[in-house]
């Protein structure tokens, strides 16, 4: 018999992955505690470290993404080493309030990937960021970790993830 999950709720109240020099953890806690409107107001006035509000109409979204996101992610693709690529990958993120709208994470990720893969010709191209969506404690992989596609010493594309014990590589199919 399956447990009745509808009667149980888990609430996360600590943020572990975000850098100490940004307020993304504060942002998440504000939204989770019902202070979303207050958070948006602060975001629009530049009150949070490491977060920038980009208001744009849907018609201009692709141009903004091309100028800001795609240009940054191309720098990751062109990095001279895995270490440089990983450092660059931490400098910029696109956060979306929704998943399945024209300006949601699915559409934005697809646009960025299509812009970057025209040259690469594969789904797992050098410089692609991969989000871990499950927990595998024995492998030190946790939901929300971000990996980076990069070739190993033999030229085989791997997804590299920084863990508490250092960099680890996995085959993209995993």
Descriptions of predicted regions:
Residues 110-174:
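Conserved nucleotide-binding/hydrolysis modules and their immediate coupling elements
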């Amino acid at each position: 018999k399956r447990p009745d999950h509808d009667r149980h709720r888990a609430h996360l109240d600590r943020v572990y992955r975000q850098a100490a020099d940004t307020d993304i953890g504060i942002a998440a806690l504000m939204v989770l505690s019902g202070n979303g409107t207050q958070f948006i107001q602060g975001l629009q006035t530049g009150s949070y470290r490491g977060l920038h509000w980009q208001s744009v109409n849907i018609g201009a979204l692709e141009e903004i993404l091309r100028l800001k996101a795609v240009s940054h992610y191309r720098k990751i693709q062109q990095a001279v080493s895995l270490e440089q690529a990983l450092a660059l990958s931490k400098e910029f993120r696109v956060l979306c309030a929704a998943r399945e709208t024209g300006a949601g994470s699915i559409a934005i990720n697809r646009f960025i990937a299509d812009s970057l893969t025209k040259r690469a010709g594969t789904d797992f191209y050098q410089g692609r960021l991969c989000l871990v969506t499950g927990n595998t404690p024995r492998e030190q992989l946790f939901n929300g970790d971000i990996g980076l596609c990069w070739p190993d010493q033999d030229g085989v594309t791997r997804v590299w993830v920084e863990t508490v014990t250092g960099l680890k590589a996995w085959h993209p199919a995993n």
